[in-house]
């Protein structure tokens, strides 16, 4: 389904290394999958100190793995569960794995560095992985198609977008119990918080909008149309702007958070899918589904 590698670029956009996703799971104490297994990388998140990257794999391929995942899967349909990889950023090699659910997608590291959180698309769940041991400590059922995750600055709560519905789950990271922000809009996919944790922003893939939610009350306080199928987004370090990729509009929208006004729209190429703000140079990196990367300078 995906090309089996992780590519690492330096800040100048030069390719530093291509990391194959082939692993010998037995070397990490995993049984039932002898020989070499391959993954299918989807998303990555970094530890606070930048020493490690954690990478989800849409599916695994090799001995002991069954049907590969698909976006049309259902919980309990037999889709094989997958693994989270840990990449050592000094050696640029995979040095740890953790078993998670079926078709893991988004990855987030809690600011206190205790957990790595993984949304399991086909298991309808959130995997909570202990970062120190690289072991799943709990799998929290959520409902169809969990996707984006963001964690509060104090690591007390995680917000999870449930793309198969209209809601956002709120996970208490101390008790690992679930609450809800209901009816934010159709197909919530990606989430970001402002630096204070006061406002939550969600892309609505189905509605073509971004919504702003007051986290204290769980109330939607604003919304803006950004384009067709807004997928991923990021927020500027000062919290004043959002950067949203619109998959079917083939562009990036810059949104002012104070009043949710679209201040700029930039063409990107066909099907922009991922985006991140690089704060040391004030640049926005955009991943295109066809395999290209577009780097924009923020003004």
Which residues does each PLM region occupy?
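Predominantly soluble domains enriched in secretory-pathway, periplasmic, or organellar proteins
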Residues: 1-299
